Amino acid sequence: SVIVGETFVSDTDFAAGQRATGAIAGVDENLLRERRQLDAVTRESLWAALAGLATGKRISAVGNAVETVVTENALINGWEAGIIEEFVGHGIGTKMHMPPDVLNYNVRGIQARLKPGMVLAVEPMLTRGDIASQTDDDEWTVRTVDGRDAAHWEHSIAITEDGVSVLTARDGGVA
């Protein structure tokens, strides 16, 4: 789903509007371009993070990949996305949210070593403005404090002997 200002738009309505018009009625073309760029950078950072995990040795491969994509796209787009630090990916096991944390940014120190059998949710969250966020009273909806756009892409993966299997992609992440 998408929240535009105070308007909630379902995934179906958003997709239908995009297919029918190629644009969202009432949205400035520059703003629409920036939103598409933010979405593309976030999606690209997800796939770069997954590729990093496939060849990396530690969970820090995610933060390295996300930061690299953000920096490279800043040069292309003329603006740099902010990496939301308050929400991160996580391990999945007997509960949905478990250690280890899967950070979308670099930190000093050694992070967990990747081991076959680990299942992780990798979920970069980027913003067009400040990275500060707030959670609504429903305890689910999160917004940026400055009201700027944010984007979130996510996949769950299993670390295998041969790399990764993208559990939430129909093709396992092969494409």
Residue ranges: model-predicted function:
Residues 1-18, 22-175:
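Active-site neighborhoods and metal-handling regions in enzymes and metal-associated proteins
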